[in-house]
């Protein structure tokens, strides 16, 4: 298994990571706004499906190391980005799903799943991220590069490592998903 996304269908990308457990240790990184803000986006999340919430993205805060953002993301990185979302599923500590996008665009959907990986004594968690209802290939390429970088940060955080600068990780996949999805 490599760390790249797969495309189960043309409107879905999926990532799998094996993280150090137990599941109860990983769940706060998904649901708790402060912990989620360490690798993805901060913001309090409701517990009742159908309720809306806001997430705040600030990629330069995900690591003590800094790297300049790519030109197309300079303004977003400087000011941060806010997204309005709707909770779709809240099933602690195994499943969390929400809309992804903003009110000016369509909404796609993101699902996080946590499952025991292998023998329980090995204390490993299978984290599956499925991003569905993706409208087109360009959007799939864009979100795949972002998720790839965010998940690398999550992997490091859960392993007790200091992650590299977000934009350095993102740059390593620049162009990779465009090639992978052109097949």
Question: PLM features: residue spans?
Answer:
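Hydrophobic/aromatic beta-strand elements that line small-molecule binding cavities or substrate pockets
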Residues: 17, 43, 82-89, 101, ...
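A short, structured loop/turn motif at beta-sheet edges
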Residues: 23-24, 46-49, 88-93, 114-126
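Glycine-rich portal/gate segments that line the openings of hydrophobic small-molecule binding cavities
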Residues: 45-99
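Hydrophobic ligand-binding cavity/cleft-lining segments
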Residues: 1-52
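Intrinsic-disorder/low-complexity, polar/charged segments enriched in Ser/Thr/Lys/Arg/Asp/Glu/Gln
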Residues: 12-16, 52, 80-82, 95, ...
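Beta-strand/loop substructures that line and gate deep hydrophobic ligand-binding cavities in soluble
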Residues: 99-156
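Short, highly charged C-terminal tails/helix-capping segments
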Residues: 158-183
């Amino acid at each position: 298994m490599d760390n790249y996304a797969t495309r189960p269908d043309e409107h879905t990308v999926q990532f799998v990571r094996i993280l150090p457990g137990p599941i109860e240790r990983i769940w706060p990184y998904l649901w708790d706004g402060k912990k989620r803000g360490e690798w993805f986006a901060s913001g309090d999340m409701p517990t009742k499906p159908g309720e809306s919430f806001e997430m705040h993205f600030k990629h330069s805060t995900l690591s003590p190391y800094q790297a300049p953002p790519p030109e197309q993301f300079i303004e977003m990185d400087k000011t941060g980005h806010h997204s309005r979302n709707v909770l779709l599923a809240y099933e602690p500590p195994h499943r969390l799903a929400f809309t992804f996008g903003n009110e000016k665009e369509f909404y796609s959907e993101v699902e996080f799943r946590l499952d025991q990986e292998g023998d329980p004594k090995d204390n490993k968690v299978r984290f599956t991220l499925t991003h569905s209802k993706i409208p087109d290939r360009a959007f799939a390429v864009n979100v795949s590069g972002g998720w790839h970088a965010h998940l690398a940060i999550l992997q490091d955080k859960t392993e007790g490592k200091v992650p590299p600068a977000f934009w350095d990780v993102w740059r390593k996949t620049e162009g990779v998903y465009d090639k992978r999805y052109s097949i």
